[in-house]
Design a protein with these regions (language model features):
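Short, well-ordered strand-loop elements centered on a beta-strand within folded domains, enriched
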Residues: 1, 83-88, 316-322
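A surface-exposed, charged beta-strand/loop segment in the N-terminal or early-internal portion
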Residues: 1-35, 322
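Hydrophobic, aromatic-lined core segments that form the binding pocket/scaffold
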Residues: 42-286, 301
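Acidic, carboxylate-rich catalytic segments that either coordinate divalent cations
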Residues: 275-322
Length: 322
């Protein structure tokens, strides 16, 4: 009875501290071997969950891997604020239409940007008027229905992350990249991913972040921070999912190696964990901690959590020796 009371007290204490990741102190006290064991469990859980998400998209895409990649690409480029809007855009402008217009970059840009419904929010210069005219023709050709502008979140968005600018970057990536699936499966390092996505936009966007608003000329290539996020949330996830699909352990290992050789994400959640010490050094570490945060801490699932169970086991042993 006393042991049960002690167990309950430990669990209640863990749950009370879950919202501010109180078990970070325990993680920081572990040696590298034991912390790696925990990260491996959590990291694989996250990869498997994302694998299931990708396979659901694969089914939605009629078992078409290039279309699946295209949907995950747009979803990832949308970031936290606009991932659902970008995913819907990928449904409305299918990859097959992109391939058919591959030799005409401005047509691809017209389809993607025109289908957002966002052009109506901005003044029209000659370039934007041409995009609109092209979209009217291409939307009839491919039966594309534009989204509502209200589906997009534009407030508190940095200029570099504006949906229209991101779509101009996606356009040049799709135009310049042949055999897309092969190229992403080949990536082994963060530099490989940077080279793959670091293509310059069409000239108009060098002096624009949004339509018709002229700025000084600045390169709009995807930067290293964004390319690392693409490596983490797109490239490695597709490598792991496709490797699982074709039962290629080497491809799954490539995904893991890439995660281990990219720096950890920088966000408020990881910063909170790192306040206990350098808990996230690589992207694999930070992905493991995100799994811990959102699947366990957020829902107070301490009894089911690998960290919570170890703390409970340690506390139980200490009680028994008293």
């Amino acid at each position: 009875m006393e042991d049960m009371d002690a167990t309950k007290r430990v669990i209640n204490k863990l749950k009370a501290g879950a919202s501010y990741f109180a078990c970070g102190g325990y993680l920081s006290s572990l040696d590298k071997l034991h912390r790696t064991e925990i990260y491996n469990t959590l990291g694989f859980e996250r990869l498997e969950r994302k694998n299931r998400d990708i396979m659901r998209l694969y089914e939605e895409c009629d078992c078409n891997w290039p279309q699946t990649f295209y949907m995950v690409l747009l979803r990832t480029m949308g970031g936290i604020d606009n991932k659902e809007a970008f995913t819907e855009l990928a449904r409305r402008v299918p990859y097959a239409a992109i391939l058919r217009e591959k030799m005409a970059p401005q047509n691809i840009e017209a389809m993607l940007i025109g289908a957002t419904g966002l052009l109506e929010l901005y003044q029209h210069d000659e370039y934007i008027l041409n995009l609109k005219r092209n979209f009217e023709y291409l939307s009839a050709k491919y039966s594309i229905e534009a989204m509502e502008a209200s589906e997009w979140k534009l407030t508190h968005i940095y200029p570099n992350n504006h949906p229209i600018l991101r779509l101009s970057q996606i356009t040049t990536f799709l135009v310049h990249t042949n055999n897309v699936m092969d190229r992403i499966l080949e990536c082994r390092t963060g530099d490989d991913v940077q080279r793959l996505f670091g293509v310059e936009t069409l000239p108009y966007w060098l002096t624009h972040y949004t339509p018709a608003a002229v700025t000084r000329s600045v390169s709009k290539r995807i930067g290293r921070t964004k390319s690392d996020l693409l490596a983490i949330n797109l490239i490695t996830q597709m490598q792991f999912a496709y490797g699982s699909y074709i039962t290629s352990e080497s491809l799954r290992e490539r995904a893991l190696s890439l995660l281990e050789n990219i720096s950890a994400e920088k966000n408020s959640v990881i910063a909170q964990w790192n306040s206990f010490g350098p808990l996230a050094r690589s992207a694999f570490d930070s992905q493991a901690l995100l799994q811990l945060s959102f699947e366990y801490c957020k829902h107070h699932r301490c009894e089911e959590c690998i960290v919570g169970r170890r703390i409970l086991r340690q506390a139980t042993k200490a009680t028994q020796t008293e």
